[in-house]
């Protein structure tokens, strides 16, 4: 507690000597009970951290801020040694509060981030390892994303000023004089925002989304990128149109045009990797991005993909509405049809067809044909069929993928994009639900569906 009470003074003076850090670590070591199973291990790790800190931080201000992170450890150490899950969770919160309070000041200085790695390393091998690691990692990630959002605001403000300047120039009826062309170049640098755009591209490139939270973060990054590039392209287009006027500066105009397309090939490669339909690691991500119409975020992202000519599977653009024959890659000679109150993959011929209807948000309803048409809906365990409405549970998504060169679809829903249907290996072949891509869970091709149009389904009855 003494250590924590000293922090305001340290921050006001901006000075923390090496002996202060050593003193803080000594206080931390004093709180460790080496008689407990984890105590000796923690004690050794604190000693290792002490040496690392002495080698790593030379700036007084940085040392002061490092003390903030150490202080948060000092308050939490007893809770982690208790072995009680509730206390461990409370300790995680203590560390999160301690780190987030100082991150506001020093997150931009990469040398100081190493203390956070040391904090995580301190607890490795203990019961609290996963909890602490995830809390600290989340704190770093959220702070980093927040910084990016703040930086975006600054770049957008720069773009807004540039756009206002160009609008003012365009509103003048007289031609631009050579000196005014120079003024344009000075006020609207063609490289504006390039570095920031490159930062976002690198984030997108290396996020490698596998979990729901990572995928949502990726989608936010993509939306961020489309906002930024759209504004920048608009400004460069305005600038090009003004300078390309006959009698002005054709060479400069040509240069601006080249700058407009600069980097698009690199961006295309990054996004085309994200949209691969033959890579199982991307399938879950596609289920969150697709269909294109699902929400404003997806619409904006796909609109931008089309603008910069990103190549992706043509089936993203298809409308599957109408009478369709649905089968699986595992059993291509059997088709999906009603089995009592369930949808099953057990019809050898198409006695009862299925009708897909595309909705305004890009999702589909699946309905039966026959004298008593019913609608399919998603439950926790199966795809069921009912004559009554089941709201959002009726909205299905067909995610286009490729499996060893064969085109197929994953069957998911709007409500649970991370859940997928597969055909059971039983006599009735009921469609069951899994919380991941079925092939990744050992179900082979049972969860990959093929779709083909068949003629005159309305004349087919049970």
Curated annotation (Swiss-Prot):
<keyword id="KW-1052">Target cell membrane</keyword>
<protein>
    <recommendedName>
        <fullName>Toxin CfTX-2</fullName>
    </recommendedName>
</protein>
<keyword id="KW-0406">Ion transport</keyword>
<keyword id="KW-0732">Signal</keyword>
<comment type="similarity">
    <text>Belongs to the jellyfish toxin family. Type I subfamily.</text>
</comment>
<dbReference type="GO" id="GO:0044218">
    <property type="term" value="C:other organism cell membrane"/>
</dbReference>
<comment type="subunit">
    <text>Oligomer.</text>
</comment>
<keyword id="KW-0123">Cardiotoxin</keyword>
<dbReference type="GO" id="GO:0006811">
    <property type="term" value="P:monoatomic ion transport"/>
</dbReference>
<dbReference type="GO" id="GO:0090729">
    <property type="term" value="F:toxin activity"/>
</dbReference>
<keyword id="KW-1053">Target membrane</keyword>
<keyword id="KW-0812">Transmembrane</keyword>
<keyword id="KW-1015">Disulfide bond</keyword>
<keyword id="KW-0964">Secreted</keyword>
<keyword id="KW-0813">Transport</keyword>
<keyword id="KW-0800">Toxin</keyword>
<feature type="signal peptide">
    <location>
        <begin position="1"/>
        <end position="17"/>
    </location>
</feature>
<dbReference type="GO" id="GO:0042151">
    <property type="term" value="C:nematocyst"/>
</dbReference>
<dbReference type="GO" id="GO:0016020">
    <property type="term" value="C:membrane"/>
</dbReference>
<dbReference type="GO" id="GO:0005576">
    <property type="term" value="C:extracellular region"/>
</dbReference>
<keyword id="KW-0166">Nematocyst</keyword>
<keyword id="KW-0472">Membrane</keyword>
<comment type="function">
    <text>May cause profound effects on the cardiovascular system of anesthetized rats (at 25 ug/kg), since the fraction containing this toxin and CfTX-1 produces an initial increase in mean arterial pressure, followed by cardiovascular collapse in all animals within 1 minute of injection. To note, the same fraction does not induce significant change in heart rate. Has weak hemolytic activity. Is lethal to crayfish. Causes cutaneous inflammation in humans. May act as a pore-forming toxin, disrupting normal transmembrane ion concentration gradients in susceptible cells.</text>
</comment>
């Amino acid at each position: 507690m003494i250590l924590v009470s000293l922090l305001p003074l340290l921050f006001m003076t901006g000075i923390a000597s090496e002996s202060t850090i050593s003193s803080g670590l000594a206080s931390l070591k004093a709180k460790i009970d080496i008689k407990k199973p984890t105590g000796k291990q923690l004690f050794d790790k604190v000693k290792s951290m002490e040496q690392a800190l002495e080698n790593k931080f030379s700036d007084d201000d940085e040392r002061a801020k490092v003390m903030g992170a150490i202080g948060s450890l000092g308050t939490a150490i007893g809770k982690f040694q208790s072995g009680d899950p509730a206390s461990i969770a409370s300790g995680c919160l203590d560390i999160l509060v301690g780190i987030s309070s100082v991150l506001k000041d020093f997150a931009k200085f990469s040398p100081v981030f190493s203390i956070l790695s040391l904090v995580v390393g301190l607890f490795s091998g203990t019961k609290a390892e996963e909890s602490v690691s995830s809390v600290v990692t989340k704190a770093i990630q959220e702070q980093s994303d927040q910084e990016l959002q703040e930086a975006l605001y600054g770049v957008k403000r720069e773009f807004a000023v540039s756009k206002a300047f160009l609008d003012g120039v365009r509103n003048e009826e007289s031609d631009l004089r050579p000196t005014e062309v120079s003024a344009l170049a000075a006020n609207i640098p063609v490289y504006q925002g390039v570095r920031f755009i490159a930062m976002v591209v690198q984030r997108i490139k290396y996020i490698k989304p596998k979990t729901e939270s990572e995928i949502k973060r990726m989608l936010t990054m993509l939306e961020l990128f489309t906002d930024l590039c759209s504004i920048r392209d608009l400004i460069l287009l305005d600038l090009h149109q003004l300078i390309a006027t006959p009698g002005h500066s054709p060479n400069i105009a040509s240069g601006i045009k080249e700058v407009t397309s600069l980097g698009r090939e690199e961006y295309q490669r990054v996004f085309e990797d994200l949209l691969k339909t033959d890579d199982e690691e991307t399938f879950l991500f596609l289920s969150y991005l697709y269909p294109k119409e699902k929400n404003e975020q997806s619409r904006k992202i796909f609109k931008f993909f089309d603008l910069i000519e990103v190549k992706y599977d043509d089936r993203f653009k298809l409308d599957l509405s109408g009478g369709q024959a649905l089968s699986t890659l595992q059993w291509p000679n059997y088709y999906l049809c009603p089995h009592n109150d369930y949808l099953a993959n057990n019809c050898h011929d198409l006695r009862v067809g299925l009708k897909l209807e595309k909705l305004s948000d890009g999702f589909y309803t699946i309905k039966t044909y026959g004298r008593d048409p019913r609608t399919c809906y998603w439950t926790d365990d199966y795809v069921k069929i009912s004559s009554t409405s089941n709201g959002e549970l009726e909205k299905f998504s067909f995610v286009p993928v490729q499996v060893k060169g064969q085109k197929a679809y994953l069957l998911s829903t709007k409500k649970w994009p991370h859940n997928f249907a597969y055909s059971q290996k039983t006599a009735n072949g009921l469609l069951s639900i899994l919380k991941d891509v079925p092939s990744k869970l050992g179900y082979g091709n049972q969860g990959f569906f093929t779709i083909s149009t068949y003629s005159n389904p309305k004349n087919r009855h049970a």
